[in-house]
Amino acid sequence: MGEDDIVELLWNGQVVRTSQPQRPSSGKPSPTPPILRGSGSGSGEENAPLPLPLLQPPRPLHHQNLFIREEEMSSWLHYSYTGVTSTPATHPQSSVSLPPPPPIAPSEDDVVELLWKSGQVVQSIQTQRPIPPPIFRGSGSGGGEETVLPLPPLHPSHQNIFIQEDEMASWLYHPLRQDYFSSGVASTSATRPQSSASLAPTPPPPSVPYGQIPVERRTENFMNFLRLRGNIFSGGRVEAGPVVIESTQIGSSATPSSSAAESCVIPATHGTESRAAAITGVSRTFAVPGLGRRGKEVATETAGTSYSGVNKAETERVQIQPERETKITEDKKREETIAEIQGTEEAHGSTSRKRSRAADMHNLSERRRRERINERMKTLQELLPRCRKTDKVSMLEDVIEYVKSLQLQIQMMSMGHGMMPPMMHEGNTQQFMPHMAMGMKGMNRPPPFVPFPGKTFPRPGHMAGVGPSYPALRYPFPDTQASDLSRVHVPSLHSNPVPNQPRFPAYINPYSQFVGLHQMQQPPLPLQGQPTSQPSFSHASTSK
């Protein structure tokens, strides 16, 4: 294998070796593997080298797989590290030894990688627990020098497993940790008195004074002073009193140890001061409230170098109002809110009152109108004969019929005087006729025309086609001259022969009609010395 070839040693219950050569080995001689020498106290073999496997690692290939099968690495790891971690029985004075293993043993799923690069072995531990590497100090009985073998820093599992060459130089000359290889690598017995290798004592943790909380150094959200300002305003009022150290939370952390800023309140009599101090890289603000009425200012300053990305709004000063002014402002805001609410309620109340008043006026006027209509309907019901209907529509229909019957009566009376032409009776008017005589007997009877047998009674032209035609009388009328018309008794229109009777000639009592007819049927006695002549009907036909 070449110098740049990579060899991986994996731990999965046992040691696994793999080698990935990139190209065949050239004719150059392979470098001699490093030799670990231990110092003994008695024998002359103190410079005897500890055997290591003669490996020729191939050139590294970053794009190939670095994990290989277990059976290819099991023999290599066991052969190479048995001489380092164990002392042969033939060398009892060997001073290279390991301390007893810790009680914590690796699980079967832990993975340990050993890489070979540029002639050196590189270890990469794939575990979740960061354990500080022990410091081995070896001392021989012949020499007084002590050599410290430092371990390279362990890298977490999420970082790159390839390390720089200068960090890998000291790893090969240091024995592997026995807690990771307790099952595959032999360990040194703890009963040997000649062993001089020991672990360096771990320094005790620094004591924390009582009443102080260690603050971790955090850089996230460090330059965002808008959150600091918001916490100052939301932290409540600032009171003057004894010195109290409060922690202001920045971000979402709620623990005091992870807070990124602390504020200290210092009492003062008057004036305004602002102090900023940087403690362990964390900005702490000291606010000095005064007793005056003007607002107090708090300045925030960053420790260390300035940051060019800080906005102007983040570095501007923040004003904090005193307690009295805060109360006055809150009272004013509360009063304004109450006044706005009351004004809104009054506006709504006035609108609702106006609407209710208009509705009341409308209801009152509607009630009055209905009362007047009911009164008029009652009056109409009293005027109609034998009307017992309560429905308004039915009452109005009866009123219409009644008015029509009255109009017909007026027309009939006018026709009797010759003032206006007759009109035809409607079919539904006859039901009101018998009940509306009004003292006129026989008004619903046909007109009193005297039938003359054998002849038709002539009628005026405007009466043609109206009503039935009556035949003429069989009995002749006496022949009267025009001069003798005064002798004929014609009832006067102004005379009232029968009391309580109407003065209309067309509407005469039937008894009077019968008497008149009987008188007309009696022929008059002929006068002596005058020839008898037939009565002329020309005058009778024309006279009425």
Swiss-Prot record:
The UniProt record lists the bHLH domain at 357-406
Q: Where is the composition biased (Pro residues)?
A: 50-59
Pfam families linked: HLH
Instruction: Enumerate the subcellular locations listed in this protein's record, separating them with semicolons.
Output: Nucleus
GO terms for biological process, alphabetical: red or far-red light signaling pathway
GO CC terms: nucleus
Which residues lie in Low complexity bias regions? Answer: 522-535
Which residue stretches does the UniProt record annotate as biased composition, category Polar residues? 15-29
Q: Which GO molecular function annotations are given, in alphabetical order?
A: DNA binding; DNA-binding transcription factor activity; protein dimerization activity
| Coarse class of the protein's main subcellular location | nucleus
Using the record's annotations, give every residue carrying the modification Phosphoserine. Answer: S274, S541, S543
As stated in the Swiss-Prot or TrEMBL entry, residues carrying the post-translational modification Phosphothreonine are T269
Q: Which UniProt keywords apply?
A: DNA-binding, Nucleus, Phosphoprotein, Transcription, Transcription regulation
- Region labeled Disordered — which residues? 12-59, 185-208, 342-364, 522-544
State how it assembles. Homodimer.
Put simply, this protein is called Transcription factor bHLH119
Q: What organism is listed for this UniProt entry?
A: Arabidopsis thaliana
